[in-house]
A protein has these predicted regions:
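Acidic, Pro/Ser/Gly/Ala-rich intrinsically disordered segments
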Residues: 1-191
Length: 191
Protein backbone atom coordinates (compact mmCIF):
# COMPACT_ATOMS: atom_id res chain seq x y z
CA UNK A 1 0.00 0.00 0.00
CA UNK A 2 2.74 2.44 0.92
CA UNK A 3 4.50 1.55 -2.30
CA UNK A 4 1.43 2.42 -4.38
CA UNK A 5 1.00 5.76 -2.62
CA UNK A 6 4.66 6.59 -3.15
CA UNK A 7 4.42 5.64 -6.82
CA UNK A 8 1.32 7.80 -7.26
CA UNK A 9 3.05 10.77 -5.61
CA UNK A 10 6.13 10.31 -7.75
CA UNK A 11 4.02 10.06 -10.90
CA UNK A 12 2.10 13.18 -9.93
CA UNK A 13 5.33 15.05 -9.19
CA UNK A 14 6.77 14.04 -12.57
CA UNK A 15 3.57 15.01 -14.32
CA UNK A 16 3.41 18.40 -12.63
CA UNK A 17 7.13 19.00 -13.04
CA UNK A 18 6.98 18.12 -16.72
CA UNK A 19 3.92 20.28 -17.19
CA UNK A 20 5.81 23.22 -15.74
CA UNK A 21 8.33 22.86 -18.53
CA UNK A 22 5.73 22.84 -21.31
CA UNK A 23 3.74 26.04 -20.83
CA UNK A 24 6.44 28.39 -22.02
CA UNK A 25 6.18 27.35 -25.65
CA UNK A 26 2.58 26.15 -25.53
CA UNK A 27 1.41 29.15 -23.53
CA UNK A 28 3.27 31.54 -25.82
CA UNK A 29 1.54 30.04 -28.86
CA UNK A 30 -1.83 30.21 -27.11
CA UNK A 31 -1.20 33.84 -26.18
CA UNK A 32 -0.22 34.68 -29.75
CA UNK A 33 -3.35 33.00 -31.09
CA UNK A 34 -5.56 34.81 -28.58
CA UNK A 35 -3.81 38.10 -29.38
CA UNK A 36 -4.42 37.59 -33.10
CA UNK A 37 -8.10 36.78 -32.52
CA UNK A 38 -8.51 39.90 -30.40
CA UNK A 39 -6.67 41.97 -33.00
CA UNK A 40 -8.89 40.76 -35.85
CA UNK A 41 -12.07 41.37 -33.84
CA UNK A 42 -10.86 44.86 -32.95
CA UNK A 43 -10.01 45.68 -36.57
CA UNK A 44 -13.58 44.83 -37.58
CA UNK A 45 -14.98 46.92 -34.73
CA UNK A 46 -12.79 49.84 -35.79
CA UNK A 47 -13.98 49.49 -39.38
CA UNK A 48 -17.51 49.76 -37.98
CA UNK A 49 -16.46 52.86 -35.96
CA UNK A 50 -17.07 50.99 -32.66
CA UNK A 51 -13.94 52.33 -31.01
CA UNK A 52 -15.15 51.92 -27.42
CA UNK A 53 -15.46 48.16 -27.98
CA UNK A 54 -12.30 47.87 -30.11
CA UNK A 55 -9.78 49.64 -27.85
CA UNK A 56 -9.92 47.17 -24.92
CA UNK A 57 -9.47 44.27 -27.35
CA UNK A 58 -6.42 45.92 -28.88
CA UNK A 59 -4.99 46.70 -25.44
CA UNK A 60 -5.40 43.05 -24.43
CA UNK A 61 -3.91 41.86 -27.72
CA UNK A 62 -0.92 44.15 -27.10
CA UNK A 63 -0.55 42.83 -23.54
CA UNK A 64 -0.57 39.21 -24.74
CA UNK A 65 1.75 39.69 -27.73
CA UNK A 66 3.36 43.15 -27.93
CA UNK A 67 3.94 44.41 -31.46
CA UNK A 68 4.34 47.83 -33.07
CA UNK A 69 1.46 47.13 -35.46
CA UNK A 70 -1.00 46.38 -32.67
CA UNK A 71 0.20 49.38 -30.71
CA UNK A 72 -0.26 51.64 -33.75
CA UNK A 73 -3.80 50.36 -34.15
CA UNK A 74 -4.46 50.95 -30.45
CA UNK A 75 -3.27 54.53 -30.90
CA UNK A 76 -5.61 54.98 -33.89
CA UNK A 77 -8.44 53.53 -31.82
CA UNK A 78 -7.79 56.00 -29.00
CA UNK A 79 -7.78 58.79 -31.58
CA UNK A 80 -11.19 57.57 -32.74
CA UNK A 81 -12.42 57.96 -29.14
CA UNK A 82 -10.93 61.45 -28.90
CA UNK A 83 -8.36 60.28 -26.34
CA UNK A 84 -5.52 62.28 -27.82
CA UNK A 85 -3.07 61.91 -24.93
CA UNK A 86 -3.55 58.14 -24.83
CA UNK A 87 -3.13 57.96 -28.62
CA UNK A 88 0.01 60.11 -28.45
CA UNK A 89 1.52 57.89 -25.75
CA UNK A 90 0.76 54.73 -27.76
CA UNK A 91 2.28 56.22 -30.93
CA UNK A 92 5.42 57.06 -28.99
CA UNK A 93 5.49 53.57 -27.47
CA UNK A 94 5.04 52.00 -30.91
CA UNK A 95 7.99 54.03 -32.21
CA UNK A 96 10.19 52.74 -29.38
CA UNK A 97 9.11 49.14 -29.94
CA UNK A 98 9.57 49.42 -33.72
CA UNK A 99 13.05 50.85 -33.14
CA UNK A 100 13.93 47.91 -30.87
CA UNK A 101 12.76 45.50 -33.56
CA UNK A 102 14.58 47.32 -36.37
CA UNK A 103 11.34 48.33 -38.13
CA UNK A 104 12.50 51.74 -39.37
CA UNK A 105 9.41 52.52 -41.49
CA UNK A 106 7.03 51.82 -38.61
CA UNK A 107 9.25 53.73 -36.21
CA UNK A 108 9.27 56.79 -38.48
CA UNK A 109 5.53 56.55 -39.13
CA UNK A 110 4.72 56.29 -35.43
CA UNK A 111 6.96 59.25 -34.60
CA UNK A 112 5.30 61.32 -37.34
CA UNK A 113 1.82 60.48 -36.05
CA UNK A 114 2.83 61.37 -32.49
CA UNK A 115 4.29 64.66 -33.72
CA UNK A 116 1.05 65.47 -35.58
CA UNK A 117 -0.96 65.00 -32.37
CA UNK A 118 1.30 67.11 -30.15
CA UNK A 119 -0.30 70.49 -31.01
CA UNK A 120 -3.75 69.04 -30.18
CA UNK A 121 -2.79 67.68 -26.74
CA UNK A 122 -4.75 69.07 -23.82
CA UNK A 123 -2.83 69.73 -20.61
CA UNK A 124 -3.55 69.70 -16.90
CA UNK A 125 -1.25 71.46 -14.46
CA UNK A 126 -1.54 70.62 -10.78
CA UNK A 127 -0.19 73.19 -8.35
CA UNK A 128 0.17 72.30 -4.67
CA UNK A 129 1.83 73.91 -1.67
CA UNK A 130 4.23 71.80 0.34
CA UNK A 131 2.30 70.09 3.12
CA UNK A 132 3.89 67.33 5.20
CA UNK A 133 2.61 63.95 4.01
CA UNK A 134 0.69 65.46 1.08
CA UNK A 135 -0.66 62.91 -1.39
CA UNK A 136 -2.21 64.20 -4.61
CA UNK A 137 -4.04 61.93 -7.02
CA UNK A 138 -5.41 62.50 -10.49
CA UNK A 139 -8.10 60.00 -11.44
CA UNK A 140 -6.93 57.75 -8.61
CA UNK A 141 -3.27 57.74 -9.69
CA UNK A 142 -0.77 59.35 -7.35
CA UNK A 143 1.01 62.39 -8.77
CA UNK A 144 4.53 62.91 -7.44
CA UNK A 145 5.65 66.32 -6.20
CA UNK A 146 8.06 66.57 -9.16
CA UNK A 147 4.99 66.82 -11.43
CA UNK A 148 3.52 69.82 -9.59
CA UNK A 149 3.58 72.90 -11.78
CA UNK A 150 4.20 70.89 -14.97
CA UNK A 151 1.60 70.80 -17.74
CA UNK A 152 0.83 67.09 -18.14
CA UNK A 153 -0.81 65.71 -21.27
CA UNK A 154 -4.26 64.31 -20.49
CA UNK A 155 -7.20 63.01 -22.45
CA UNK A 156 -10.12 65.42 -22.82
CA UNK A 157 -12.92 64.87 -20.32
CA UNK A 158 -13.43 65.02 -16.58
CA UNK A 159 -10.50 64.47 -14.24
CA UNK A 160 -10.86 64.11 -10.48
CA UNK A 161 -8.05 65.66 -8.45
CA UNK A 162 -7.78 64.64 -4.79
CA UNK A 163 -5.40 65.78 -2.09
CA UNK A 164 -4.93 64.48 1.44
CA UNK A 165 -2.42 64.70 4.26
CA UNK A 166 -2.40 63.28 7.79
CA UNK A 167 -4.28 65.56 10.18
CA UNK A 168 -5.93 67.60 7.40
CA UNK A 169 -9.33 67.52 5.72
CA UNK A 170 -9.13 65.88 2.28
CA UNK A 171 -9.79 68.05 -0.78
CA UNK A 172 -11.32 67.07 -4.11
CA UNK A 173 -12.20 68.84 -7.34
CA UNK A 174 -13.36 67.76 -10.79
CA UNK A 175 -11.72 69.52 -13.72
CA UNK A 176 -13.20 69.29 -17.21
CA UNK A 177 -10.59 69.36 -19.96
CA UNK A 178 -11.71 70.20 -23.47
CA UNK A 179 -10.26 68.84 -26.71
CA UNK A 180 -7.82 70.58 -29.02
CA UNK A 181 -5.07 71.92 -26.80
CA UNK A 182 -7.21 72.95 -23.85
CA UNK A 183 -5.19 73.82 -20.76
CA UNK A 184 -6.42 73.87 -17.18
CA UNK A 185 -4.80 74.28 -13.79
CA UNK A 186 -5.95 72.65 -10.58
CA UNK A 187 -4.63 74.51 -7.54
CA UNK A 188 -4.64 72.40 -4.40
CA UNK A 189 -5.36 74.75 -1.49
CA UNK A 190 -3.27 74.65 1.65
CA UNK A 191 -4.91 71.85 3.57
Amino acid sequence: MIGNRLLRKMALALLLGGAALLPHGAHAQGAKAAAESLFQAAKQLMADKKFAAACPKLAESQRLDPSPGTQLNLARCYEGLGKTASAWAEYKGAAVLAHQLGQKDREDGARDLARELEPKLSKLTIVAAATPGLVVKSDGIEIGAASFGTALSVDPGEHVIEASAPGYEPWRVTVTIGPNADAKTASVPVL
